[in-house]
Amino acid sequence: KNAINPELVAGGSSGGSAVNVAKEYTVFSIGGDTGGSVRQPAGYNKIYGLKPTYGRISRYGLMAYASSTDCVGPLAKSIEDIRIVLNVMSGKDTKDQTSITSTEISEKSISNNTVKTVGYFKNFIESEAINPQIKADFKATIEKIKAKGIEVKELDFFQSDILVSTYYTLAMAETASNLSRLDGTNYGNRIEAENLKETYAVTRSENFSEETKRRIVGGNQVLSQGFSDEIYLKGLAIRDQIAENFKKDFEEVDIILSPVTPNNPPKIGDSLKDPLAMYLSDAYTVGFSLGQLPTLTAPQGTATGLQITAAKNNEELVLQFANFLKELI
């Protein structure tokens, strides 16, 4: 249940982590963010949540969902706690070959704002799908930023439906591959049946949730013969275009600002009735995941917060700007 309104969802999949922090059961918590699963719950529960640069924090010990975008990130009520936990968790790990070395972020380095230019995606804000109040609140935040002498630029980006479909095409394909080992032979809870084939079927049918099974079936479909070239490989090509788009954007701006979600948190149970609506709630988070960029949810600016994104390996600038926004809004 949401920490602020128990009739609303806490967000997923790290909703429990976010609620624990929001209710002050813990000083910080750790979540997994593949397409927004740290950032969305952080926004829904009005705390900070960071998805770091892909590879900055080791994924060793994390159950793999979509390996190309899986990240581990901290959630906390203060920017300083985010900084401390990030420093402790960051670094190269021999048990995760995708992990990278990184420099420690000092308290002093994030105390003064050095951001000169901020960008935002016009199509996110002008979308018909965005809640009018979130749109109005975001625009008001932009005006406050301009009033402080920071240049703000409108940026072009991929449409939300393309981002969501690309993300779920790749994520489902990787999910089908990653979870294929959970058949009860070496991994997973085994449920015996009359023969081996039925044992596999019952084990996977009973142990996976409906949503997990939906994603596995979707992943197997896009990887199957006749679909792979048309769907999966096209998804990979679009992901490369997204990364190139971000590279050009960060030649023009220091930070990209966006809402975390286009709408307010739904009531408990509503998302299960409409899986498509649930997927579309990720419209503003998945693009940054595909770009493997550092992105922080800050609990200001709109009903579900603001996303602050910088170029790869620039978490310091993200935290800097979060401190600036905290004082501004």
Residue spans of the language-model regions?
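Serine-dependent amide/ester hydrolase catalytic core
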Residues: 126, 160, 183-287
